[in-house]
Structures are given as structure tokens and as C-alpha cells.
Amino acid sequence: MNNTIYILGAGSIGSLLAYELASLKSINNRVILLLRDKSRVNSFKDKNSTLKIDRLFEENVPHLCCQVTASEPSQLNVQSIENMIVTTKAGQTENALSKYLPYLSKNSNILFVQNGMGAVENVCGKLWPEEQNKPSIYQGVISHGCFQTAPFHFSHAGLGDLKISKVPKNPKKILPDEAAETPCEMIKSLGKSELLRLRYMNYPELLVNQCEKLVINACINPTTATLDCVNGELYNDESAKELFRCIIKECVDIFFKCIPLFKNNEEAEKILNVNRLLDRVMFVGTKVNGANSSSTRQDCLLLRETEIDAINGYVVKLAENNGFQATVNKTMMLLTKSRLGLNRCRAHAR
């Protein structure tokens, strides 16, 4: 059995997970970063194959460094991949993952840890249309704040947690034996990192937490991107708080109208309460992660495509697919796209 853990996506979250895993004695050198191409691998080697992490929530801590092996599709010399963590942007997942299809089988375990919702269902449906060939799929929801400050150098700005569940074959009809399944060894390895603070849960519980995270992102990401600010600058802003309430109210309304698992679900009603969520956005989003620059803001600053279609755009699409409208979230989505377009025009005009 090959227990190597391959991490597809070397952005802030992928690199944070790679660092935490590679730092475990039980893992040793069994972590491999899967990068885009040879030039990206060579760039990493020029940095001595080292990931650097700064923990902004800890005082007087020097750069944390860890060497990790990197590879890319044409350099991979293995027969199979049994354990993979996917942290690519939602819109890039299908293309990135398809390059590794020859190495993945029904015996593989794949954990998706990404912003937004909807990408996993879409990608798995396209890449594995036949259920019997599909790998075991796990979904992760992470609340750690992390952003890139230089190539392969990241700031861990907010201490959060990592929630994981195995995705059932039919999420709308979960069998009792699926709900009771124990996690695979890859998930257990993540649990050995004290800093990641992993919680393993059943799928309905994770779905509620996934929606909670989506709401936080739907507030913080487009607002910080459009206003070009770090999270903490919104902490005492009453106008931002009023805007967040409008976003949250619409998200919650759409979730309960459109997600069957939330019907008569006391946990969902408790977690996805508008006032509670507003408190969470202000606490987790603007205080705990106050020093963080959201991924969407970073993308806009670096003129890269954002994940806004999988965040506010997911709420818009969920609403429209069920005959409703999500005008507040659509406005935030369009403002973010306009911000990116404006930044690109300004950069081109220089």
C-alpha cells in the first residue's frame, strides 16, 4: 500500500496542509505537492523545495520552514495515487484533476478543501459518471485564514479548524452504514496535527457547517475585494455589518427553500440563524482573521480569476435552479467581477 499523500494545488490552503502534514514524524517524506508544470516545479526547487509559513497569531515566532517534494503530471512515476487532497480553485478543479485520472481508482481517497460549494458534485459527476469506478470522496471545510506573501511563502493569519466528512454515494439518501463509516488513514493523519484542529463528522452535519462557511465567505470575500481592504478593517464598520446582514438573510432563505436535508433539521435551524451568522461573520471573519487578506481580494490584486462563482454565485445558481432570485448575492458577485476587470484595465493601461 502506498500511503503517500499528494496535494493538488499549492496555494495558501494547500501549502498550509502540506506544511502541517510534512511536519509530522509519522508522515516523514510522504507528502508530494502536485504543481502545474515543469517550470513551476523548477521554481519551487530554486526555493530549495521549501515552504515557509509565518504564524501571524503567534508573537516572536520566526519563519517556519519545511522541505517538501514537488512533482507535475509528466514527472510522476507511480502506478497509482491512493491519497489526494485537492485545494485548487473551484473553477480549475476539473482540468487539474483530469490530468491524474490514470492514477486514480475506486480504491483512492480524495479530500476536497476549497472555497465555495458545488464544484465537487459537478467534477465527480463528469470525471466518474459510473458510480462503481468513483474514488472515496471526502469534503473538508476549513476556517484557518492564510494568504500568500511571496512565492511559496505564506502568512497563517487566523487560527481556525478543519471539518471533514465522507461524502455519501447519494447525499439525498444517506444509508446508516455510510453515516457510521470511520475515516481513512489520510484523514487520521490530518487529525494528528494539533494546529489544524480537525473534526470528523457525518455528512448532514458537515453540510450545515459548509453552508455556514459559505455565508462567511459570501460576506467577507466580495466586500474585501471590492473595497480593497484586509478583513479587520471591516470590524467596526456599521455599514459593512448592515450589508452582511442583507447577504446572510438572503443566503439562509435560499438554503432552507432549496436544500432538502435542511427540512425539519434542528441543527440547521440553530447554526444557520441570521443573528448567529452575523456574529460569526464579525468574529471569525473580521476579528479572528482580522490580519487576513481574503483569497478573492488577493486574486483581484494579482489579476487572477476569482472563485466568486462558487461563493455568492453558488447561492445565485441554487436560487435560480429552484425558481427563486438572489439579487443581493448577484450584486456582490457582479461587483467583484467589475473590481477584477477594473484592476486588469488599469494594469494594461500602465
UniProtKB/Swiss-Prot annotation:
GO BP, sorted A to Z: pantothenate biosynthetic process
UniProt xrefs under SUPFAM superfamilies: 6-phosphogluconate dehydrogenase C-terminal domain-like, NAD(P)-binding Rossmann-fold domains
Positions annotated to bind substrate: 115, 217, 221, 295
Record-annotated active site: 213 (proton donor)
Protein's pathway: Cofactor biosynthesis; (R)-pantothenate biosynthesis; (R)-pantoate from 3-methyl-2-oxobutanoate: step 2/2
Function: Catalyzes the NADPH-dependent reduction of ketopantoate into pantoic acid.
Family: Belongs to the ketopantoate reductase family.
Name of the featured protein: Probable 2-dehydropantoate 2-reductase
Organism: Schizosaccharomyces pombe (strain 972 / ATCC 24843) (Fission yeast)
